[in-house]
Amino acid sequence: NWIKQQCYDLWDNWETKRIENIKPDIIEYYDGVIFTGAHSSLTKDYPYLSRAEHILDKIVDYEIPTLGICFGHQLINKLFGGKIVQSPLGMEIGVVDIQLTLEGMSDNWFINSNTGKIKVYSCHEDIVIDPGVEFVQLAWNNYSIYQATAYRDFIRTVQFHPEFYKPILKIYIKKNMDRLKKQHNKPLHNVKSISKAIDNVRELPMSADALHNFVKYVRTKNKSG
C-alpha cells in the first residue's frame, strides 16, 4: 500500500502477489515488477527462492523493468550470484546518507541528483557484500558498500526504502527500540543516540525518486512499446 500511495498519481493498475503465487510464464505480459521489502533474512534458505529464480529468468528474457527494494534488492542480487550477510554493525535504521557513484549520478532512472550525496530512509540488517554478476554499483555508504545496484537497462535495486514516509520510519524505529539498544552499546553508526534517530526523521522527497522514476520509466517504455 505504501508503494501505491507514493505513486498514486503515476500508476493505477497494480497487482500485489506473493512470489509463490506468481506464474513465471505470464511475466512477459507485465509492464513492470517490484520486489518489495520483507521481514525475512536471505542468510537463510526458503522454498520460494527457486520460483523467484524462474521469475527473474523471465524478467531477463523479456527485459521487464524491475525494481528491488530492501529485501528485494538483496533477493535479486543473491539470485544473480551475489552474497548476503547479516551486518556486524547491527541495524541501519533512520535517515542515512548514501553516496552516489558516477554511474548512480548519471543513471537515467535512478535518482535525480548531481550532488553525489543524498539522504534516504533506511531499515535493514542484512547487506549485500558481493553483488550479482554484471551488476553495477550505483550508491554506497560506510554501512553497506552496495546501497543501490543496476543490471543493464531494466533492473535497479535499492537497499533503502523509497516507499517510506516520515511517520512510517518513526514507527519502525520505535518498534525496534529495545533491539537497537542491545545492538548499539556504543552510539549508533549514523546518529549519536536512538532518540536522536527519531528526531532526525524528516520528509525526504529525493528518497522517493528511485520509486517515482522507476514508474515513470515503466510508463515511457509501455508507451513506446
Task: Enumerate the language-model features and the residues they cover.
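Pocket-forming structural segment of enzyme catalytic cores
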Residues: 81-167
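C-terminal and late-domain segments of enzyme folds
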Residues: 140, 144-225
